[in-house]
C-alpha cells in the first residue's frame, strides 16, 4: 500500500492510501514511522502504525484530561472509552501513565484526604465513599484514613455548627443537631460525641424561655391554619418537644398562650 496523501487537520494528520483506506494519526506517528507521500507500507507496518497512532492519540487525550486536576486510573480509562479508544490500547496508556507518574491512585487518595483536612468538612466514611466512586480501591484508601486524625476537623465542624444554631435551639436540640450533622458528614458517633466536649452549651433560663417563645410563635402560625382547640394544643406540644424543649416548660407556656 502506498500513501497518496498526508494532510494536517488541526491536531491530527489525515493519511490516505491507494487502496481507498484512510486514517488519522498524530504528529508523533508521522515522525516515528517517517511517513511521507508515496511511501509504501506492508500490512504489518500499517498495523503497527495504526496501533501506535491510537496509543499516541489516546495518551495525548489522557494528558489533556489530567492537565485540569489529578485523576484516578478508572477516571482516565472511562474518559478514553468515551473517545472510543480500544480497551487494549487503554491498558497500555494507563501503564505508561503510571510508569511516568502521571497517575497514582494512592497519591490521589492522600492528596484528597489532606485537602479535606485543610479546607473540607467530611469525615472518613464519606471520604472513603467519594474515593471509591472515583474508582480508587479500598486498599489504597484505608491505610491513609487510619493514619489520619479527624478529631480536630470534627471539632472545627462542630464549632461552626454551634455558632450557626446556638441562638436558635435549646441545648439538647443543639447537641442532637450537631451530632446528626457530623454523622451525615461521615464522622463516627464516638468522634461526634467527643467533639461536643469543647463546646459550652450552658444557657440561662431567660435565654431558653426566649427561644421557646420564638419557636412557639413560629409553630402556632404554621399549625393554627389546620388545627384548633385541643388538637392544636397537642400538635404544638409535640412540635416543641421534638425541638428539645422541656416538657414542663412547654405545658406552662401553652397554658398561658392558648
From Swiss-Prot:
Coiled coil: none annotated. GO terms for biological process: regulation of DNA repair. Pfam families: RecX_HTH1 (PF21982), RecX_HTH2 (PF02631), RecX_HTH3 (PF21981). It is found in: Cytoplasm. Keywords: Cytoplasm. InterPro entries: RecX_HTH_1st, RecX_HTH_2nd, RecX_HTH_3rd, Regulatory_RecX, WH-like_DNA-bd_sf. GO terms for cellular component: cytoplasm. Gene3D superfamilies: Winged helix-like DNA-binding domain superfamily/Winged helix DNA-binding domain. It comes from the Bacteria. Modulates RecA activity. PANTHER family: REGULATORY PROTEIN RECX FAMILY PROTEIN. NCBIfam families: PRK14135.1 (NF010733). Belongs to the RecX family. This is Regulatory protein RecX.
Amino acid at each position: 500500500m502506498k500513501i497518496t496523501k498526508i494532510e494536517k487537520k488541526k491536531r491530527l494528520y489525515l493519511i490516505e492510501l491507494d487502496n481507498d483506506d484512510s486514517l488519522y494519526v498524530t504528529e508523533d506517528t508521522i515522525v516515528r514511522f517517517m511517513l511521507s507521500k508515496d511511501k509504501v507500507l506492508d500490512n504489518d507496518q500499517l498495523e503497527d502504525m495504526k496501533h501506535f497512532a491510537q496509543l499516541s492519540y489516546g495518551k495525548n487525550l489522557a494528558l489533556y484530561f489530567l492537565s485540569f486536576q489529578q485523576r484516578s486510573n478508572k477516571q482516565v480509562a472511562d474518559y478514553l472509552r468515551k473517545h472510543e479508544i480500544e480497551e487494549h490500547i487503554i491498558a497500555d496508556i494507563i501503564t505508561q501513565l503510571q510508569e511516568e507518574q502521571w497517575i497514582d491512585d494512592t497519591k490521589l487518595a492522600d492528596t484528597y484526604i489532606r485537602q479535606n483536612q485543610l479546607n473540607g468538612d467530611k469525615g472518613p466514611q464519606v471520604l472513603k465513599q467519594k474515593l471509591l466512586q472515583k474508582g480508587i480501591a479500598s486498599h489504597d484508601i484505608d491505610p491513609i484514613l487510619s493514619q489520619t486524625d479527624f478529631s480536630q476537623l470534627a471539632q472545627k465542624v462542630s464549632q461552626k455548627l454551634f455558632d450557626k444554631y446556638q441562638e436558635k435551639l435549646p441545648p439538647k436540640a443543639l447537641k442532637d443537631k450537631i451530632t446528626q450533622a457530623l454523622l451525615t458528614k461521615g464522622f463516627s458517633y464516638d468522634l461526634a460525641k467527643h467533639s461536643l466536649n469543647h463546646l459550652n452549651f450552658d444557657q440561662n433560663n431567660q435565654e431558653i424561655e426566649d427561644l421557646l417563645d420564638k419557636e412557639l410563635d413560629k409553630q402556632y402560625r404554621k399549625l393554627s391554619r389546620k388545627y384548633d382547640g385541643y388538637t392544636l394544643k397537642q400538635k404544638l406540644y409535640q412540635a416543641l418537644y421534638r425541638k428539645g424543649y422541656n416538657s414542663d416548660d412547654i405545658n406552662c407556656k401553652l397554658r398561658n398562650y392558648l
